[in-house]
């Protein structure tokens, strides 16, 4: 029976930490070319929103969306996260035509999110999407689309 080594050298931990931060910093810098007119218009739409910013997404995109909503709310912008599946169970009532939906999906083709979009459109709520696929259905149905490309997760 072998004994598990529970000690990791500090240099190794530090090296992994530094590498992760470098990769995250580079991933952010890689987004600069995608800051186009749609980005400017999307920011303007959210800034001038008379209601709430409703952030939505499924899976990891949902987790990112929840963080975005929490950050917006904590800095003074009325915002919350809604799981697109929850709208079928009464959460649609919190939305009005004064709101803006910020929809996140890496593929832009997430089935649960795409079933939610017609309800948003029916309520005349503008949609800003952030996806890795500018030709996706989600991008197509959005007022403004922002492309984000993620090569690798740190």
Regions found by a protein language model. Name each.
Residues 51-154:
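Glycine-rich phosphate-binding loops that contact phosphosugars or nucleotide phosphates
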């Amino acid at each position: 029976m072998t004994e598990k080594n529970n000690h990791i050298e500090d240099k190794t931990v530090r090296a992994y930490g530094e590498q992760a931060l470098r990769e995250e910093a580079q991933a952010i810098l890689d987004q600069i070319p995608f800051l186009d007119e749609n980005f400017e218009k999307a920011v303007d739409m959210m800034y001038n929103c008379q209601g709430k910013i409703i952030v939505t997404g499924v899976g990891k995109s949902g987790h990112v969306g929840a963080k975005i909503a929490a950050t917006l709310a904590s800095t003074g912008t009325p915002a919350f996260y809604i799981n697109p599946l929850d709208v079928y169970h009464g959460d649609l009532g919190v939305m009005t035509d004064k709101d803006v939906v910020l929809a996140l999906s890496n593929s832009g083709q997430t089935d649960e999110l795409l079933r939610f979009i017609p309800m948003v459109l029916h309520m005349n709520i503008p949609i800003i999407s952030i996806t890795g696929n500018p030709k996706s259905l989600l991008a197509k149905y959005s007022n403004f689309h922002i492309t984000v490309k993620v090569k690798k997760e740190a």
